Design a protein with these regions (language model features):
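A short, N-terminal "cap"/entry segment at the start of jelly-roll beta-barrel domains
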Residues: 1-43
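Conserved short histidine dyad/triad with adjacent acidic residue
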Residues: 39-60, 94-95
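Conserved hydrophobic/aromatic beta-strand scaffold that supports enzyme active sites
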Residues: 46-48, 65, 90
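Short, conserved beta-strand element in jelly-roll/cupin
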Residues: 51, 60-75
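Short hydrophobic/aromatic-rich beta-strand segments that constitute the beta-sheet cores
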Residues: 58, 75, 109-112
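Short acidic-glycine-tyrosine-enriched beta hairpin
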Residues: 79-95
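Ligand-binding loop in jelly-roll beta-barrel domains
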Residues: 89, 95-114
Length: 114
């Protein structure tokens, strides 16, 4: 009998990969992103993500669940509702959510896209 393999990440440590710059910056400060992909298939993605200070236009193309472990940022939706993020925050962004993200202190999160 074959059992599914559990995914375990003891530490992000040296596994972090540079994923480049945010593609839709607002202003001169361009956020840099990096992370670690835990699992990816055609219908989901799970991983660790971190982002430096800056602001950008944000469009979530699939449902995304996030648990923020460090930093501070604000998500402002197109209808002007605001989500303030701090360590320990959990957020869910539905497919096609649009708005702006402003990172004021480098953020780190674990996420699941589905």
């Amino acid at each position: 009998m074959n059992f599914p393999k559990a995914i375990h990440l003891k530490s992000t440590g040296n596994n972090i990969i540079d994923w480049g710059n945010i593609e839709t910056p607002i202003g001169d400060q361009i956020s840099k992103v990096s992370g670690y992909l835990l699992d990816k298939s055609s219908n989901h993605e799970m991983g660790y993500w971190q982002c430096s200070e800056g602001e950008w236009d944000c469009h979530v193309t699939k449902n995304e669940f996030c648990h923020f472990v460090e930093g501070e940022c604000t998500y402002t939706s197109e209808d002007s509702s605001v989500i303030n993020i701090s360590p320990g925050s959990i957020a869910f962004f539905p497919k096609d959510w649009k708005g702006k993200c402003k990172v004021v202190k480098k953020i780190k999160k674990f996420y699941c896209i589905f």
